[in-house]
């Protein structure tokens, strides 16, 4: 069996006080978003199935030490919800993202990792009403920063903001 390529995930922030950084729900959700984007990317470029991807990430990467790097623990149910939701709804999400992109920049032309970020963010904006839209947009811009330069994170921000205003207009009129 071929060893999977090491996904890029953030290391935990330094300890502060008695609480471990990974103990906070927000940290576990942030780690889940990052892992979900990496999993979606891996599925997109490698053709892996969802069950194999879940098994690999949950057993090998998330919350484990790999090659001297400690990966953040992630909220497994949240990770699974994002990945399975994007896979299930991709045919609805992609046209939404396409509409939000600048003319002449179809989603197929966008780098695979940015497609994964936008799909995950769009899914969460549509289906996870328990999380404020501005938080979702900000979190996925942060995830994008882990992979790409500032110009591309600006595009992620613009696209997800437009989608947020479409699904959650009431949050922007307050």
From Swiss-Prot:
What InterPro entries does the database record attribute to this sequence?
NusB-like_sf, NusB_fam, NusB_RsmB_TIM44
Write out the coiled-coil annotation as residue ranges. Answer: none
In its keyword annotation, does this UniProt entry include Transcription regulation? yes
Keyword presence, Protease = no
Which residue intervals make up region (Disordered)? Answer: 1-28
Pfam families reported for this sequence: NusB (PF01029)
Where is this chain compositionally biased, Basic and acidic residues type? 16-25
Domain of life, per lineage: Bacteria
Q: Which GO CC annotations does the UniProt entry carry?
A: cytosol
Against NCBIfam families, the record matches this protein to:
nusB (TIGR01951)
Family stated for the protein in its record: Belongs to the NusB family.
Function in brief: Involved in transcription antitermination. Required for transcription of ribosomal RNA (rRNA) genes. Binds specifically to the boxA antiterminator sequence of the ribosomal RNA (rrn) operons.
User: Per its record, how is this protein called by name?
Assistant: Transcription antitermination protein NusB
Q: What is the lineage of its organism?
A: Bacteria, Pseudomonadati, Pseudomonadota, Alphaproteobacteria, Hyphomicrobiales
């Amino acid at each position: 069996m071929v060893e999977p390529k090491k996904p890029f995930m953030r290391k935990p922030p330094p300890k502060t006080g008695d609480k471990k950084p990974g103990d906070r729900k927000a940290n576990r959700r942030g780690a889940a978003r990052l892992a979900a984007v990496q999993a979606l990317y891996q599925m997109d470029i490698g053709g892996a199935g969802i069950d194999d991807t879940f098994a690999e990430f949950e057993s090998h990467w998330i919350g484990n030490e790999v090659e001297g790097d400690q990966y953040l623990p992630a909220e497994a149910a949240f990770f699974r919800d994002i990945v399975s939701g994007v896979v299930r709804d991709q045919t609805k999400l992609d046209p939404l993202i396409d509409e939000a992109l600048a003319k002449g920049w179809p989603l197929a032309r966008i780098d695979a990792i940015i497609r994964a970020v936008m799909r995950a963010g769009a899914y969460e904006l549509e289906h996870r009403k328990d999380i404020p839209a501005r938080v979702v947009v900000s979190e996925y811009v942060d995830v994008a920063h882990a992979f790409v330069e500032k110009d591309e994170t600006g595009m992620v921000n613009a696209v997800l903001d437009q989608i947020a205003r479409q699904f959650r207009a009431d949050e922007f009129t307050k």
